[in-house]
Curated annotation (Swiss-Prot):
UniProt key word RNA-binding: yes
UniProt-listed GO biological process terms: translation
Signal peptide: none
Pfam families named among the record's database cross-references: Ribosomal_S13
Family of this protein: Belongs to the universal ribosomal protein uS13 family.
Chain's gene name: rpsM
Organism: Brucella canis (strain ATCC 23365 / NCTC 10854 / RM-666)
Protein name, entry field: Small ribosomal subunit protein uS13
Quaternary organization: Part of the 30S ribosomal subunit. Forms a loose heterodimer with protein S19. Forms two bridges to the 50S subunit in the 70S ribosome.
Length: 122
């Protein structure tokens, strides 16, 4: 298994598919990286030389924010919104949907399991 950005990449998959196992790299960035390094689309990770793996690793380190750094930045952005006290920050703090979804009947994923209310029967 090749190790790129602290993640073990599966060896039997195509390179652009295997790169998507790294947090922060999706289909678009994976294609960009593969074309920038100059690797054919149908090559598999186990067919790559150590030099090509090193080129991929350097391209990712130079141009993309992935794994821990990306997670840290996202959590810092959410924390900043919460510290500002803006509407989006309040919604994050209260564990409610942030982007305007309805909460009267839905949003169970964000709010958690339904809490029973004493004396409330139909």
């Amino acid at each position: 298994m090749a190790r790129i950005a602290g993640v073990n990449i599966p060896t039997n998959k195509r390179v652009n598919i295997a790169l998507q196992y790294i947090h922060g790299i999706g289909p678009k960035f994976a294609r960009e990286i593969v074309t920038k390094v100059g690797i054919a689309d149908d090559r598999r990770v186990n067919q790559l030389s150590d030099a090509e793996v090193l080129q991929i690793r350097e391209a990712i380190d130079a141009d993309y924010q992935v794994e821990g750094d990306l997670r840290r930045e996202v959590s810092m952005n959410i924390k900043r919104l919460m510290d500002l006290g803006c509407y989006r920050g309040l919604r994050h703090r209260r564990s409610l949907p942030v982007r305007g979804q309805r909460t009267h009947t839905n949003a169970r994923t964000r709010k958690g399991p339904a809490k029973a209310i004493a004396g409330k029967k139909k």
